[in-house]
Swiss-Prot record:
SUPFAM superfamilies: Glu-tRNAGln amidotransferase C subunit (SSF141000)
Alphabetized UniProt keyword annotations: ATP-binding, Ligase, Nucleotide-binding, Protein biosynthesis
Protein's UniProt name: Aspartyl/glutamyl-tRNA(Asn/Gln) amidotransferase subunit C
Presence of the UniProt keyword Protein biosynthesis in the record: yes
Gene name linked to the record: gatC
Reaction(s) the record says it catalyses: L-glutamyl-tRNA(Gln) + L-glutamine + ATP + H2O = L-glutaminyl-tRNA(Gln) + L-glutamate + ADP + phosphate + H(+); L-aspartyl-tRNA(Asn) + L-glutamine + ATP + H2O = L-asparaginyl-tRNA(Asn) + L-glutamate + ADP + phosphate + 2 H(+)
Record's subunit section: Heterotrimer of A, B and C subunits.
Organism in which the protein naturally occurs: Nocardia farcinica (strain IFM 10152)
EC number per UniProt: 6.3.5.-
Length: 99
């Protein structure tokens, strides 16, 4: 017995505001029946002894310790900038005057 009937597919199509032809109704009924069959098979797997998890991989902390390293001086950072004004990067204006 199919898990979903052609009438149920037509009802879902109406709810979704989809206009389906008779051939499409038959096609989608078969496809949805196959999908629901696979879901039913998966739900029958005995997973009572498997703990719930958000990820199949073990979660480990992959961060490294913070170490202080010297950074660029303002002059070094601005040296490669195409335009500088008052020790700041100059960029094209993207908003109007009043915005």
């Amino acid at each position: 017995m199919p898990a979903i009937s052609r009438d149920e597919v037509a009802h879902l199509a109406r709810l979704s505001r989809l206009a389906l032809s008779d051939a499409e109704l038959d096609q989608f009924a078969g496809q949805l029946d196959s999908i629901l069959s696979h879901v039913r098979t998966i739900s029958e797997v005995a997973a009572a002894d498997v703990p719930a998890t958000a990820s199949p991989d073990p979660v480990t902390n992959v961060t490294r310790p913070d170490t202080v390293v010297p950074g660029l001086t303002p002059d070094q950072a601005l040296a490669a900038a195409p335009a500088v004004e008052e020790q700041r990067f100059m960029v094209p204006q993207i908003l109007g005057e009043g915005e």
